[in-house]
Amino acid sequence: MIVRNKWIGAVAFMSAFFVDTVVAQVGKPFIHDPSTIVECEGKYYTFGTGGGGLISEDGWTWNSGAVRPGGGAAPDVVRIGDRYLVAYGATGGGLGGGHNGVIYTMWNKTLDPQSPDFGYSE
């Protein structure tokens, strides 16, 4: 038992020398509470808390530019038929106990903000 404990201690001690430094994501892009990644017309989109989102041509390199009005938190997007449903939460808060939560939804024919068919409707 003593040998086992010494061995475990030695492994734990030595593992400190072989751990890579963990760093936060640096550079662009940044998104908080990202939605499901969805493909639309050959591009990939994801949306985040506070509005806006990211677009990718290859699903790997992301740039800002996706549009989602309304602010709110923790959005998600799903394709249903020929349209996209975007749902996101909005909450009230404060010390007065007014913690009302609401789920909002928006529909769009495309997620490409450059398309003439782009435009959200509730």
Report the location of each language-model feature.
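Bacterial N-terminal signal peptides
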Residues: 9-20
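Carbohydrate-active catalytic/glycan-binding domains of CAZyme proteins
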Residues: 22-122
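Bacterial N-terminal signal peptides that target proteins for export
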Residues: 1-10
